[in-house]
Design a protein with these regions (language model features):
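Bacterial N-terminal signal peptides that target proteins for export
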Residues: 1-10
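Hydrophobic h-region of N-terminal signal peptides that target proteins for export
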Residues: 11-20
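Beta-strand cores of secreted/periplasmic/IMS beta-sandwich domains, seen most often
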Residues: 23-26, 39-58, 79-88, 114
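Soluble periplasmic/extracytoplasmic beta-strand elements of cell-envelope proteins
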Residues: 26-30, 48-52, 63, 93-95, ...
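Short helix-initiation/N-cap motifs at beta->coil->alpha
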Residues: 33-36
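Surface-exposed loop/edge segments in extracytoplasmic proteins
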Residues: 69-72
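Extracellular/periplasmic metallocenter environments
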Residues: 75-115
Length: 115
């Protein structure tokens, strides 16, 4: 009886920690006139990430080939969310994946994954 009570107390104490570890790191990125804000996103390796992209003007896109994240397109009315779990530290460039005007090629950012 004493062992099962100890196990129950231990499980109750650890449960919030386990749930917290699975909670995604959430970031909202605004896109407008050839820039992402923020253009630098810091996340931790091994933890789920959820990035929501919103546009303030026209259609834009997001693509990060180095993290094998597929292209998404979004506009003012329809945001897009990308979910992933980075497995190794590093700096990964992302870019706008939808032609949005003359400054399109400058529309870049980086995802910095730390240990």
């Amino acid at each position: 009886m004493r062992l099962s009570r100890t196990a129950a107390v231990l499980a109750a104490a650890l449960c919030p920690l386990l749930l917290q570890a699975q909670e995604p790191q959430k970031v909202t990125v605004m896109a407008k006139k050839y820039e992402f804000q923020p253009s630098r996103i810091e996340v931790k390796a091994g933890q789920p990430v959820e990035i929501t992209f919103q546009s303030e003007d026209t259609k834009h896109g997001f693509e990060c080939k180095d993290l094998k994240l597929e292209k998404v397109v979004f506009d003012k009315e329809t945001p897009a969310t990308v979910s992933f779990t980075p497995d190794k530290a590093g700096t990964y460039e992302f870019k706008c994946a939808k032609f949005c005007g003359m400054g399109h090629s400058k529309m870049k950012g980086e995802i910095v994954v730390t240990e």
